[in-house]
Regions:
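Conserved active-site segments centered on acidic
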Residues: 1-75, 137-142
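Phosphate-binding/catalytic loops
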Residues: 82, 86-142
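Alpha-helix C-terminal capping/helix-to-coil transition sites in glycosyltransferase folds
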Residues: 78-79
Length: 142
C-alpha cells in the first residue's frame, strides 16, 4: 500500500481539504492501494481545521471536522512514499529533506485560503479537486 502525504503550511486548510477530497474521490471511484494523510511545515499540533474549510467540505459531503493538525516530522517522512505539496515554496523546502522525484506540486500551486471568505475556500477546493486526476496519473508512474 502506498502512503501519500498532503503538505501545506499550517495543516488547517489546504492539506486537510486535499486529504478529504482525495479520500472521498478514491472511495467513490474504487481506487485502492493508496492511503493518505496530511501535515504542515509550520503546523501547531492539535489545531482544528479552519471553520470555512469545514464548511466547504461539508458542502461536498466530506466531514473534516475531526481533523487535528500535525507537524511534518522526520518519522512521518520515513513512512511516506510521496508528498503532495501545495506551493512551489513547500516543494523547494521539502526537496532538501526528501527525494525530489517523490514530490508533486498539486494544481501548479494552491493559493492559501487562510482567513478568506467561504467563496475563497470554495475556489481552493475546486483547485485541489482539479489536480486530483493529474496526481493519480503521476502516482501510477512509480
Amino acid at each position: 500500500m502506498k502512503q501519500i502525504l498532503f503538505v501545506c503550511t499550517g495543516n488547517t486548510c489546504r492539506s486537510p481539504m486535499a486529504e478529504g477530497i482525495w479520500n472521498e474521490w478514491t472511495r467513490r471511484w474504487g481506487i485502492k492501494g493508496i492511503q493518505s494523510g496530511s501535515a504542515g511545515l509550520a503546523a501547531f499540533p492539535g489545531d482544528a481545521p479552519a471553520e470555512n474549510a469545514v464548511r466547504v467540505m461539508a458542502e461536498w459531503g466530506i466531514d473534516i471536522s475531526a481533523h487535528r493538525s500535525r507537524a511534518l516530522t522526520p518519522e512521518l517522512l520515513d513512512q511516506t512514499d510521496a508528498i503532495v505539496c501545495m506551493t512551489e515554496e513547500h516543494k523547494a523546502a521539502l526537496a532538501r529533506l526528501y527525494p525530489a522525484e517523490r514530490l508533486f506540486l498539486l494544481s501548479h500551486g494552491v493559493r492559501d485560503p487562510y482567513g478568506g471568505s467561504v467563496e475563497t475556500y470554495r475556489r481552493c477546493a475546486d483547485q485541489i479537486f482539479d489536480g486530483m486526476q493529474e496526481l493519480l496519473v503521476w502516482l501510477r508512474t512509480w
